[in-house]
């Protein structure tokens, strides 16, 4: 009886920690006139990430080939969310994946994954 009570107390104490570890790191990125804000996103390796992209003007896109994240397109009315779990530290460039005007090629950012 004493062992099962100890196990129950231990499980109750650890449960919030386990749930917290699975909670995604959430970031909202605004896109407008050839820039992402923020253009630098810091996340931790091994933890789920959820990035929501919103546009303030026209259609834009997001693509990060180095993290094998597929292209998404979004506009003012329809945001897009990308979910992933980075497995190794590093700096990964992302870019706008939808032609949005003359400054399109400058529309870049980086995802910095730390240990």
Where does each model-flagged region fall?
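Bacterial N-terminal signal peptides that target proteins for export
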Residues: 1-10
